[in-house]
From Swiss-Prot:
PROSITE patterns tied to this protein: RIBOSOMAL_L5
Any one GO MF annotation of this record: structural constituent of ribosome
Lineage, highest ranks first: Eukaryota, Viridiplantae, Chlorophyta, core chlorophytes, Chlorophyceae
Record's protein name: Large ribosomal subunit protein uL5c
Primary location class: plastid
Biological process per Gene Ontology, one example term: translation
Length: 186
């Protein structure tokens, strides 16, 4: 079985660096990636099934794994939403697909964003997980501009086993995530 380039880099390079940096006594204490969740909410999904289908297809192409359709849990009259109507699509990546997606995100997709200055350090949630929002799916090289129905963004949550934001920041920085400098707010 072929091991992913990023996973190999994690095992051979990142783990020893983090053991030294945080003075872990055991290799199992080193934080690791648990899963990556890609979520896309679609407001028109209840009225237009074609938008939902194309969005699910795009997310499947981006993630390399078939997504699921998320449905509303309760009715909200202000949004013209009934219970159990489709409202979005979601994919949870683990294992090799997770490392493959993170590799493509860091090395191919993020550099293609116009006026990209780095990822915000404030997007950690306090338990060592990182979330980022993407404004358009065109940053992924797998998506062909002529075949998209509608330009929509998505939320990407990177779940780690770390207990603090500092550990998760060090882990993602070692993976190559381009963070802004701490003092830089732009």
């Amino acid at each position: 079985m072929k091991i992913n380039r990023l996973k190999k880099y994690y095992l051979q390079t990142i783990v020893p660096k983090l053991i030294e940096q945080f003075a872990y006594k055991n290799q199992m204490q080193v934080p690791r990636l648990e899963k990556i969740v890609i979520n896309r909410g679609i407001g028109d999904a209840s009225q237009n099934a074609k938008v939902l289908e194309s969005s699910l297809k795009e997310l499947t192409i981006i993630a390399g794994q078939k997504g699921i359709i998320t449905r509303s849990k309760k009715a909200i009259a202000g949004f013209k939403l009934r219970q159990n109507l489709p409202v979005g699509v979601c994919v949870t990546l683990r294992g090799e697909r997770m490392y493959s997606f993170l590799d493509r995100l860091i090395n191919l997709a993020l550099p293609r964003i116009r006026d990209f200055r780095g990822m915000s350090v404030e997007s950690f949630d306090g338990q060592g997980n990182y979330s980022l929002g993407v404004e358009e799916q065109l940053m992924f090289p797998e998506i062909v501009y002529d075949k998209i129905e509608q330009i929509t963004g998505m939320d990407i949550s990177i779940v780690t086993s770390s207990k603090t934001n500092d550990e998760a920041h060090a882990l993602l920085k070692e993976f190559g995530m381009p963070f802004k400098a701490k003092g830089n707010k732009n």
